[in-house]
A protein has these predicted regions:
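Solvent-exposed soluble domains appended to multi-pass membrane proteins
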Residues: 5-22, 26-29, 34-317
Length: 317
């Protein structure tokens, strides 16, 4: 997908001024998708759509559906596209064997603290091995979280965002934090722990997995609102990046019913690979609505609004 025009960096964020460099917090939210992109009548308005000031937002193509989270990480962090790899492989586990270029490595070279965090097992997708190779000085996992605010059996987005705020408050240098959430992970079969999260979908009855998923996304939105409210009040410059890794693997009949027909053409199937994203700043920056881009291009938007000179590879992108 061609990359839409990038906003110019604001004059107040000089490309070479260490003092002006903002902290950058990136959140890849598990299975965060906007089902109303299949049919506006679905009607569940997500929080990101309400962001207008100092916000770049839109949809981005992910290379995966229903799983394969690490490949969405790889695309964002490196700028590389999964289009050039065999279908179904995990780049993390098959190809990264030595230190590799990434956004984390570049920002580390500019003097940033680099932290990657995921409130689940460190062995997942070999993150405990791969993240340091991508330039993350510090990595934290499930055992580093209080685990007092779980939804189902997973650390909630709210607890993770509180953890992120704590790390921000204790940084010694500008912070680049990359967080991968766990709250909305499959499966979506309601049980005693999760029934209270279900949101009745009157137009589409008979899909308890979709009802549970909708409730989880509403919890994500509440947590996201909390996070941005906190950073709105922070005087230091901060960039918040948020995107979904992939569409959830819900009942295919549910998607067919929402869309109104089978997903037959390539263009129609791509609808299940479009995830929301936004890049928000707590300082003045140009707002842009992006109809469609790809996850591997998102770092360019981040560098621009942060006032950081694009690395050579990103200039090629």
């Amino acid at each position: 997908t061609p990359q839409p025009p990038l906003p110019r960096p604001t004059a107040s964020a000089s490309a070479d001024s260490t003092a002006e460099r903002p902290s950058i917090i990136v959140i890849m939210d598990e299975a965060y998708a906007d089902i109303s992109t299949l049919n506006p009548e679905f009607g569940d308005t997500l929080f990101y759509k309400k962001l207008h000031k100092n916000t770049i937002k839109g949809l981005a193509l992910s290379s995966v559906y229903g799983g394969g989270t690490a490949n969405s990480e790889y695309e964002f962090l490196t700028g590389n596209s999964m289009a050039f790899f065999n279908h179904g492989i995990s780049v993390y586990q098959m190809y990264i064997k030595a230190p590799a270029y990434s956004m984390a490595a570049h920002l580390k070279g500019l003097g940033y603290e680099t932290l990657a965090t995921h409130p689940f097992h460190r062995q997942g997708w070999s993150r405990e091995t791969i993240w340091p190779l991508l330039g993350f000085e510090t990595t934290t996992f499930l055992e580093d979280y209080p685990q007092k605010k779980k939804l189902r059996d997973y650390v909630s987005d709210r607890e993770m965002f509180e953890y992120i705020i704590d790390k921000f408050e204790h940084k010694k240098k500008p912070l680049f934090l990359y967080g991968v959430t766990m709250q909305n992970h499959s499966g979506y079969i309601p049980d005693g722990k999760s029934q209270k999260l279900q949101v009745p979908l009157k137009q589409y009855p008979g899909y308890p997995d979709a009802e549970l998923y909708t409730g989880l996304i509403r919890e994500s939105d509440k947590a996201l609102k909390y996070l941005l409210h906190y950073f709105e009040q922070v005087k230091e410059k901060v960039v918040i990046v948020f995107y979904g890794d992939h569409f959830p693997g819900l009942n295919k009949e549910f998607y067919k019913e929402v869309y109104g027909k089978e997903f037959t053409s390539l263009k129609e199937r791509q609808k299940l690979y479009k995830v929301p994203f936004f890049v928000w700043t707590n300082y003045e920056s140009k707002s842009v609505d992006v109809p469609l881009t790809s996850l591997n291009y998102l770092s360019n938007y981040v560098y621009k609004v942060a006032g950081i000179r694009l690395p050579a590879y990103n200039r090629v992108l």
